[in-house]
Amino acid sequence: MAYHWQVISRLLIALLRVYKLVISPLLGPRCRFAPSCSDYAMTAIGRFGPLRGSWLAARRLGRCHPFHPGGFDPVPDAPTSPSPSSSCSCKGPHP
């Protein structure tokens, strides 16, 4: 099943590259953020997969408008596997 997600991720990233090569030059620089929204989307999909990556990209596109100040907005880091002590909400010592 993981193979299907990789294929979908590659397809989405390929579509974003076509957008950057063909459509984006016609529109000119419009993104208020660094990295650009298309670069953000490619990184998010590559890092988190097509579902969560697309969700992060959609949220980013929702913030990319004239009333938002923009600025540096990197893709969040991928979660690491939690250590036993970091996932525990108890207050006592850990064995």
Swiss-Prot record:
- Keyword Cell inner membrane in the entry? The reply is yes
**Where is the segment annotated Disordered?**
72-95
- Tell me how this protein sits in the membrane: Peripheral membrane protein
Q: Where in the cell is it found?
A: Cell inner membrane
Determine the domain of life of the protein's source.
Bacteria
**GO cellular component, as recorded:** plasma membrane
SMART domains, per database record: Haemolytic
- The annotated regions of Low complexity compositional bias extend over 83-95
Predominant place of localization = membrane
Q: Which UniProt keywords apply?
A: Cell inner membrane, Cell membrane, Membrane
The role this protein plays is: Could be involved in insertion of integral membrane proteins into the membrane.
Which HAMAP family does the UniProt entry name for this protein?
A: UPF0161_YidD (MF_00386)
The UniProt entry's sequence similarity note says: Belongs to the UPF0161 family.
Family matches, as PANTHER family: MEMBRANE PROTEIN INSERTION EFFICIENCY FACTOR-RELATED
Mind telling me what this protein is named? Answer: Putative membrane protein insertion efficiency factor
> Which source organism?
Xanthomonas axonopodis pv. citri (strain 306)
Q: What is the lineage of its organism?
A: Bacteria, Pseudomonadati, Pseudomonadota, Gammaproteobacteria, Lysobacterales
